[in-house]
């Protein structure tokens, strides 16, 4: 039986794509996953190009795989994802021992590329953008319980000045409405309880409805998914403030299955920086969205993405960012120092802010958000949370699950039928706040 190893870099879209690669090669060649490249017949790197030096990390990994391939000449090496899309044949030029290179839109052709490599002995490269045809050629997910990703669209058409996504994943293309519902219904019928809707900009979703000319927006899609039997919880990522409509806010008011946690990237709190980033909204407009959201969901927790040290950022700009964070009370968020990405407009902007200043700003922002996050954790102490059990914690003893607000909670398992709890919803009373997790005790064991 052939074995497959996949190393995934970056976002949830890549995690979803890696799962589809595994499903595809299992269906076509009977491959099973392994935890180490040393045991694998096929090794795939599913790459991300969002952060600086992403390419260097990939080629560093490829260098280690080259040494492994010397001892296992039959092993095939593939590079997928956004670095593959960005670099293309340059990957094979720099690392001729790489067998296949494929982009996010051509992963459905992976089996064919591998077959061609074996047949011809030549490295295969396909980084084309055949819109969204890949979903017509991928097998159904093998996920049978717990939480599952469902991609509803691909690409992004916003062209923020610092971002490579439109160049590596293409323009926004939405999956047909019925196709998404069919996939969700199939997962729910297998025992999946939580659906996570994925896209670079999910709230730009506009899916064709059947053979009619009607188009479904993101709000309507959520309403329909909430009606599918077996679906107990709905999440989504990532959304864009520019298209966070009143219709979507209204859905939060009437669809309780949609979690009270929102990840809405703001990137900055200064209008001048937001304009330079080409984000398409002001700080006040972002604050207005959150105010409306908390009017319909008072218990909403908010996380975001922040970039500090963007070219031209002054002390006054940074103070505006801190003021926004203080006003809106963010939970755990992703904070980065700006890193120029080749080929983006922001890479050409003048940047004379010393790195030490940027680092200090980052540390200040992180400390502020960490303090807010800890306050949110403390408020959960003593409360009972509905938790979806994901599996064993890293200690191999406790179970861990995720609350509606996305917090990870550890608890001691019952004496019997631990496996029966995995993928189920249970009630956990929070008893302790730790650095990055919460600890609790099982209240309900209805599945045992």
From Swiss-Prot:
One GO cellular component, as annotated: cytosol
Domain Radical SAM core: residue ranges: 142-375
InterPro entries, A to Z: Elp3/MiaA/NifB-like_rSAM, Methylthiotransferase, Methylthiotransferase_CS, Methylthiotransferase_N, Methylthiotransferase_N_sf, MiaB_methiolase, rSAM, rSAM_horseshoe
Keywords from the UniProt entry: 4Fe-4S, Cytoplasm, Iron, Iron-sulfur, Metal-binding, S-adenosyl-L-methionine, Transferase, tRNA processing
Catalyzed chemical reaction(s): N(6)-dimethylallyladenosine(37) in tRNA + (sulfur carrier)-SH + AH2 + 2 S-adenosyl-L-methionine = 2-methylsulfanyl-N(6)-dimethylallyladenosine(37) in tRNA + (sulfur carrier)-H + 5'-deoxyadenosine + L-methionine + A + S-adenosyl-L-homocysteine + 2 H(+)
MTTase N-terminal domain sequence ranges: 2-119
UniProt remark on cofactor binding: Binds 2 [4Fe-4S] clusters. One cluster is coordinated with 3 cysteines and an exchangeable S-adenosyl-L-methionine.
Domain TRAM as annotated: residue spans: 378-444
Binding site for [4Fe-4S] cluster 1: 11, 48, 82
Location(s) in or outside the cell: Cytoplasm
E.C. designation(s): 2.8.4.3
Pfam families in UniProt: Radical_SAM, TRAM, UPF0004
GO molecular function: 4 iron, 4 sulfur cluster binding; metal ion binding; N6-isopentenyladenosine methylthiotransferase activity
List of residues binding [4Fe-4S] cluster 2: 156, 160, 163
Gene3D superfamilies per UniProt: Methylthiotransferase, N-terminal domain, tm_1862 like domain
Cofactor(s) needed for function: [4Fe-4S] cluster
Quaternary assembly: Monomer.
Family to which the UniProt record says this protein belongs: Belongs to the methylthiotransferase family. MiaB subfamily.
Biological function: Catalyzes the methylthiolation of N6-(dimethylallyl)adenosine (i(6)A), leading to the formation of 2-methylthio-N6-(dimethylallyl)adenosine (ms(2)i(6)A) at position 37 in tRNAs that read codons beginning with uridine.
Name used for this protein in its record: tRNA-2-methylthio-N(6)-dimethylallyladenosine synthase
